[in-house]
A protein has these predicted regions:
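Short, low-complexity N-terminal intrinsically disordered segments enriched in polar/charged residues
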Residues: 1-32, 127-129
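Short beta-strand edge/turn micro-motifs at domain boundaries
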Residues: 98, 102-125
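Hydrophobic pocket/interface hotspot
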Residues: 14, 26-27, 34, 47, ...
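Short beta-strand segments enriched in hydrophobic/aromatic residues
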Residues: 30, 85-87, 101, 118
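A solvent-exposed, acidic/Ser-Thr-rich amphipathic alpha-helical stretch
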Residues: 4-5, 23-76
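A short hydrophobic beta-strand element
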Residues: 76-85
């Protein structure tokens, strides 16, 4: 792995892409054969077409998608993000639940794998509220 990668900077660009709510901006930071998995909700999603659809569905499922960062831990070729997903259904109050991302990158700094873990009790409560 190249020592020249600034993982914190890559993580910041990746977060900004998610906050833009633009699946294509997110995909621009992914390797072509990258994998995404929302553990407990989906199996592995692989490839640009499937990832674009999955990311678009995230924004449909969680209107006004937002992120509150609690911790960002970086390594040579990965980061771990402890965060809260916020969203606001039409005409309702903001809701939220905790999540944890483990994101791996290649030598070019492109995301090769993103695993997201949720507190499923919080997700269920947020969706039911």
């Amino acid at each position: 792995m190249s020592k020249s990668l600034n993982i914190a900077e890559i993580a910041g660009r990746y977060a900004a892409a998610w906050l833009s709510h633009d699946p294509d901006a997110i995909l621009a930071l992914h390797a072509p054969d990258s994998i995404f998995q929302a553990h407990g909700r989906t199996g592995e999603v692989k490839g640009n077409t499937a990832l674009r659809q999955e990311f678009a569905q995230v924004f449909e499922r969680y209107p006004d998608f937002g992120v509150v960062t609690h911790r960002l831990l970086v390594g040579d070729n990965h980061w771990t993000l402890d965060w809260t997903l916020t969203f606001r259904p039409s005409g309702k109050d903001q809701r939220s639940f905790r999540a944890l991302d483990v994101v791996e990158v290649d030598a070019k700094g492109l995301v090769t794998r993103k695993d997201t873990f949720f507190d499923h009790a919080q997700v269920k409560a947020a969706l039911a509220a």
